[in-house]
Amino acid sequence: MFNVYEFFNRINEVRPESRLDAGQPDIPVRREIIEEAVESLRRGETGYTSTGGIRELRERIAEFEGVSADEVIVAPGAKILIAAEIASAKKVAVVSPRWNAYSLIARQFWREVEVIKTTLDERWIPRVEEIKADLIIINYPNNPTGRVLSGKEIRGLLDVAEENGVKVLSDEVYAELSFTRFTPARELYENVVTVKGFSKLYSMTGFRLGYAIGERNEIRRIQRFIESTVTCVPPFVQRAGVKALELRDELIKEVRRAYLERVRMASKMLRGFDFVEPEGAFYIFLRTPQDGMAFAERLLSRGVAVFPGMAFGDYPNFIRISLSGKGLERGLRVIREELECALESRATEGWEGSSRGVSAEGSR
């Protein structure tokens, strides 16, 4: 299995000029959020809190999610919540391409993984008649494709889950960054646990703050898992989360607009190549004329970092471009040059890349 973290460490060593690899938002955390965390620390809020999260934070989440506070649990990041669900399953199904953490976590718990592969030619729509697992993980808006399933498309998948008695874990961390109508899975099917976080909309990646929404008994089960592993979220982080939610409506408009502008720019610059224009999130999953890993290595030699498609499943002829890093326009120009060069030399023995010079800064 391709190790995305090892590749990420290599990128950090190279220090490329254009960082279009990780899903690390480059929009700064709002000053008010940071100040709230600092003030909380100054007030001495540094001890343990209740495992499920402080009441004020859960109530604010519940208010805009349209649920009760007892149906919400807060945790240090979304991963531990995903782990709690995977640990309770015997077999896990994942819709691919997907964030590789799902499979990595499943391996840690020795869980079998069923892969439901989707294709670019079918616009990444899952075509499935049976699910042979007791938990399926879905992620829309999708990382890495940017797809947002229509209400009809998501209903078709959830109907199969219901027919097979399968619980659904809906990773909706990019939900507020949807550029089209987004239908939460829990609106269409009862047996759904929704996982969301503060990393993408609020840029609070280092704060490690996530939450889950589910039926009360499910939330109590997740709480027992949190109690036996990571205990709780630091109180000053939760206070920052409360402040972030006060800014939520303003940030949704501001941040969504910023990423939509980038998506439109990137789609225009890469017009003519194979990808589905993103309907949410901030990624482009693009088919390469030749091997995606070799293509990613060539781009890295020119000071542009992207992730190869193998980081997201069995997609050797793809790369994922993140539109949230530095040097975006330069990186997109280099990617287009290399795509054009690869197409021109497709009929030859090998592809040596564009004749343009390697960036001195990017090769450090």
UniProtKB/Swiss-Prot annotation:
Highest rank taxon of the organism: Archaea
A Pfam family this chain is assigned to: Aminotran_1_2
Catalytic activity: L-aspartate + 2-oxoglutarate = oxaloacetate + L-glutamate
Compartment(s) of residence: Cytoplasm
Any one Gene Ontology BP term: amino acid metabolic process
The keyword S-adenosyl-L-methionine is annotated on this UniProt entry: no
EC number per UniProt: 2.6.1.1
Record-listed N6-(pyridoxal phosphate)lysine modification sites: 200
PROSITE patterns: AA_TRANSFER_CLASS_1
Oligomer and partners: Homodimer.
Family statement: Belongs to the class-I pyridoxal-phosphate-dependent aminotransferase family.
Name by which UniProt lists this protein: Aspartate aminotransferase
Recorded name of the encoding gene: aspC
